[in-house]
Amino acid sequence: MKLSLSPPPYADAPVVVLISGLGGSGSYWLPQLAVLEQEYQVVCYDQRGTGNNPDTLAEDYSIAQMAAELHQALVAAGIEHYAVVGHALGALVGMQLALDYPASVTVLVSVNGWLRINAHTRRCFQVRERLLYSGGAQAWVEAQPLFLYPADWMAARAPRLEAEDALALAHFQGKNNLLRRLNALKRADFSHHADRIRCPVQIICASDDLLVPSACSSELHAAL
């Protein structure tokens, strides 16, 4: 699996791995790179089955597989210890990494993560799946910002959102891969073993997030 590694800003700089959500694209983190690269060697990547890591995913594809293939790619790149920042699905992959490779993960930052999918989040994805089946990739992509951003924020950034829509559509991962990654997200359940995570964990959430209620982060905090 291909990784994008920034040059270390100094000798033995710590490594931070950025894991995006269901879209799978490493470009999700572009706004943060300039700041992070001043202090860290930053690893971004397109998740398997997306972007520059194309593949056909198995029907039983899982969060554990996502974590394993990322860890193997990091080891192959000579990276033994790393911090993880994960958003949504990426936070789930980060928790799996912390559980399966505790000697490697130094710290975990969970952004809008959860223990297991909330009923509200499941409902949102059901609506989006119907859009995918009825309107195809374009309907899925165009609806995505409505589940992510406040209306005022979107209204003030219409050209940016149109450009992001065009990019997402051009690099759409395909319906089958998307649904298999989504099913992996739905099946994930850390409610019985999150307390086994031993590295420091920082939890970040948005109080006005439409897709993931902030209560999910509170539940995660309590479980840790």
Curated annotation (Swiss-Prot):
Gene3D superfamilies: alpha/beta hydrolase. This is Putative carbamate hydrolase RutD. It is an enzyme of class 3 (hydrolase). It catalyses: carbamate + 2 H(+) = NH4(+) + CO2. Keywords: Hydrolase. GO terms for biological process: acylglycerol catabolic process; nitrogen utilization; uracil catabolic process. Belongs to the AB hydrolase superfamily. Hydrolase RutD family. Its EC number is 3.5.1.-. It comes from the Bacteria. GO terms for molecular function: hydrolase activity, acting on carbon-nitrogen (but not peptide) bonds, in linear amides; monoacylglycerol lipase activity. Involved in pyrimidine catabolism. May facilitate the hydrolysis of carbamate, a reaction that can also occur spontaneously. Residues 14-115 form the AB hydrolase-1 domain. InterPro entries: AB_hydrolase_1 (IPR000073), AB_hydrolase_fold (IPR029058), AB_hydrolase_sf (IPR050266), Pyrimidine_utilisation_RutD (IPR019913). GO terms for cellular component: membrane.
